[in-house]
Regions:
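N-terminal Sec-pathway targeting helices
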Residues: 1-14
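Polar/charged alpha-helical tracts
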Residues: 2-3, 24, 138, 197
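Hydrophobic alpha-helical membrane-insertion segments, chiefly the h-region
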Residues: 13-23
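Signal peptide-directed extracytoplasmic domains
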Residues: 21-188
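Bacterial extracytoplasmic/cell-wall-associated proteins, especially those involved in peptidoglycan
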Residues: 47, 124-131, 142-372
């Protein structure tokens, strides 16, 4: 009898010691990996045993048993969320469980500014480590995601909505372009679609015009005015004479070096709006919400011309003679003064300290030459 009692006592003591050890480990920070950071993927539908084994293998917790004890103590067994998690410091099992219960998954924040082409977006995709740029371009060449919205689309240029995205580390190009086109469709509110229909504009025309507006001005107050200029030109059959469309053609041909030359304006491309009337074949960049709204709600104006003031704004004109005066003031005189080293050139920022870009005078002459 004494031996039985002794045996029971030993078992109780050992069990208590084991429980105490497990209890202490639950509250003991642990780090079993040598790298600066460790990533663990928790699959959808994974059970507590599988999660514990993954965490133990990655060195996040000491062992799967300790994790399960901690999970039982926490009462959060049904709250753990799937996803990829990043760990970079010692953590107790309870802290690990709290992280998984909150769904504090690791994401990469990526910003795609307004006005980028799909090729420029592809470089951002690659720069953030998601994969080669050409995989993004390949995915963007497939117009399937927006065929219901725009049957005329040849690719996703213009439909990859520009904004900041929080993405899982292993996001592939196909998944991202689907997300971006889905976001684009969400931005197309019923009011915006109704405004387009009221103006008898197809979605292809809306996005194409909006992309031009996006490239021409970054000022919110000017977008409706720029849209109004191009709407007026389209109405009377006047060439759009839009530099960004020519630049886009050169970019697609791999011939753009940062400068636009007079000879480029006669190049044979359907995107050359100096040579071919009407809108180009499709969007030349990804417009933001404001540019889309401007395209369907342009300013009610009789402006036909505009020219840069070299401070981010533009001077608008109704007649060609008025436009020529603006060009002389804000372009010809401005760059002439810069070359002469005079400070405070009209419309400039910093006078002679502002760098004179190659081809600026040629651009001024082009602006003066734009007419019906």
């Amino acid at each position: 009898m004494k031996k039985l009692l002794l045996f029971v006592l030993i078992v109780v003591v050992l069990a208590g010691a084991a429980a105490a050890l497990q209890y202490s480990r639950v509250r003991e920070p642990y780090r079993g990996y040598e790298a600066a950071e460790q990533f663990v993927e928790i699959p959808q539908g994974a059970g507590s045993r599988g999660i514990g084994e993954r965490l133990a293998e990655a060195g996040i917790v000491r062992d799967a048993r300790t994790f399960r004890v901690a999970l039982w103590l926490s009462g959060q067994g049904r709250k753990l969320k799937a996803g990829e998690y990043r760990f970079d410091r010692p953590m107790t099992p309870l802290e690990v469980i709290d992280k998984l219960a909150r769904g504090d998954v690791y994401v990469v924040t990526v910003t795609f500014p307004e006005g980028l082409t799909m090729f420029e977006m592809a470089r951002i995709f690659e720069a953030h480590g998601f994969g080669p740029a050409d995989t993004f371009v390949a995915a963007a060449r497939d117009a399937t995601p927006i065929k219901d919205l725009d049957p005329a689309a040849k690719d996703l240029e213009g439909y990859l909505f520009p904004e900041t995205y929080a993405l899982p580390r292993r996001t592939d190009a196909s998944k991202l372009v689907r997300l971006m086109t889905s976001r684009f469709e969400h931005v197309l509110t019923p009011d915006l679609r109704e405004a387009a229909a009221a103006r008898h504009l197809s979605m292809h025309e809306v996005v194409t015009l909006a992309s031009i507006v996006e490239k021409e001005t970054a000022r919110a107050d000017e977008r409706p005015l720029v849209a109004g200029v191009y709407t007026n030109r389209l109405r009377i059959g006047m060439a759009l004479a839009c530099d960004p469309t020519v630049i886009y053609a050169l970019q697609r041909m791999g011939r753009y070096n940062g400068n636009l030359h007079k000879a480029d304006l006669s190049m044979d491309s359907p995107y050359n709006t100096y040579r071919y009337p009407g809108l180009p074949p499709g969007p030349i960049a990804s417009p933001g919400r404001a540019a889309l709204e401007a395209a369907v709600q342009p300013a009610d104006t009789d402006y036909l011309y505009f020219v840069s003031r070299n401070d981010g704004s533009h001077a608008f004109a109704r007649t060609y003679d008025e436009h020529k005066r603006n060009v002389e003031k804000y372009q010809v005189e401005y760059f002439r003064d810069l070359r002469a080293g005079r400070s405070g050139a009209a419309g400039g920022e910093g006078g002679a300290e502002r760098e004179l870009k190659p081809g600026a005078m040629a651009q001024a002459r082009r602006s003066a030459a734009r007419r019906p």
